[in-house]
Design a protein with these regions (language model features):
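Short helices/loops that flank or line small-molecule/ion binding pockets
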Residues: 71-76, 90-101, 112-118, 205-208
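Short, Asp-centered acidic motifs that coordinate Mg2+ and/or phosphate
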Residues: 29, 102-103, 121
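Hinge/capping helix and adjacent helix->loop/strand transition within the periplasmic-binding protein
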Residues: 4-91, 139, 152-185
Length: 225
């Protein structure tokens, strides 16, 4: 997705790789401190509209999944919230709990670990609820229709890999992700098995490229190289 954010890359995702298949998806959660009066995403949006430019959210850095999720929320709702980029997830946690920011995008493992009793998740960035935290609504359910800032992991091969080899790799990937023990292990890490065909994987990448290009159109944020 870096290319969609204006970063010049030495490769082309479609030309320089053979796309084998989508493997996993994962989500972030928009969270506030446990003592925050806001109980819903709608309340946060209302507050942000009442106080433009005064609410800030912590992300794991410019161009990170948290930054993308925050910018998508900003563009889809018209609110003015400020991204405060930190160097990784641990700094994001410290910033939120230390009251440096009002909001943060954090992982499921954070909420089920250090965040227990200290953070309050308001919405999950995926289009579907996270099976590990099923009581947290999606952004769409919370009032932002069409919102989806899930991120994914996929398998790629060198360019010009023979189609028969790509098909075999895809088959093996599907078999591995169908294993219940593997799926359960992944779920504890906030990862959801989402195998696809090479063609479906191509569509996912292209759709994501266009979405993030639209989201960041006109932005001057310097994305990490």
């Amino acid at each position: 997705m870096s290319a969609a954010l204006g970063v010049k890359l030495p490769y082309d995702a479609f030309r320089d790789f053979a796309l084998v298949g989508l493997a996993l998806t994962s989500c972030n959660f928009l969270a506030v401190r446990a003592n925050n009066k806001a109980e819903t995403l709608g309340e946060v949006i209302a507050l942000a509209k009442a106080k433009p430019g005064q609410l800030s959210y912590a992300s794991q850095g410019l161009g990170s999944t948290g930054h993308l999720a925050g910018e998508l929320l900003r563009t889809m709702t018209g609110i003015d919230i400020v991204n405060v980029p930190y160097k990784g997830g641990s700094e994001v946690i410290t910033a939120l709990l230390g009251s440096e920011v009002e909001l943060a995008f954090v992982s499921a493992t954070t909420l089920k670990g250090v965040g227990v009793g200290r953070m309050k998740p308001l919405a999950v960035t995926c289009a579907r609820r996270d099976p590990g935290l099923p009581n947290v609504p999606t952004f769409a359910e919370a009032g932002v229709a069409g919102y989806d800032a899930s991120f994914w992991y996929g398998l790629l091969a060198p360019p010009r890999t023979p189609p028969t080899i790509v098909a075999r790799l895809n088959s093996e990937l599907r078999a591995a992700l169908a294993d219940k023990a593997i799926a359960q292990s992944l779920e504890t890490q906030g990862l959801i098995a989402a195998p696809s065909s090479p063609e479906e994987f191509t569509k996912v990448i292209r759709a994501g490229f266009e979405k993030w290009k639209r989201t960041f159109a006109g932005r001057t944020d310097k994305i990490q190289q």
